[in-house]
Amino acid sequence: MKTYWNIEKTLKAIPEWQPNCWIQVTCPTDEDQRELEEKFNIPDYFLSDISDTDERARYEYDDGWMLIILRIPYVKEIRSRTPYTTVPLGIIHKRDVTITVCFYETNMMIDFVSYQQKRGEGFTDYVDMIFRLFLSSAVWYLKRLKQINALIEKAKHN
């Protein structure tokens, strides 16, 4: 799923790409990936690295493109023996193009959009948006750690 967001005064969905908008790509199809590579000429290995569930967090720069891979919290299935894990979130940027790509639908990204819309403000620039993504990730890590600690305490008392 691909969503284009105007990020200037408020976070508002728009029908197509415009310079300086945010392109949020969640669970991209092969067609979505092809379009990103062809329309924006992003390095093809960026998307394959983001799709690798074991990819480590890192920063990379190639031909003017910046790639940041974050590991963000993800709950596989609450009934799973190990429901908590992390998945890669790719942030791709060059001049007037900012794209986030995650091959999983995560509560963090849903909440990030919802929270920014409730704030009623956009982002000052792509750096502001990236730092807010880092902050959101930290908040969700703390939330998941509290849940894990509660489960540990419950297991101790049983």
Label each PLM-derived region with a short phrase.
Residues 1-158:
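Peripheral, non-transmembrane regulatory/ligand-interaction domains of membrane transport proteins
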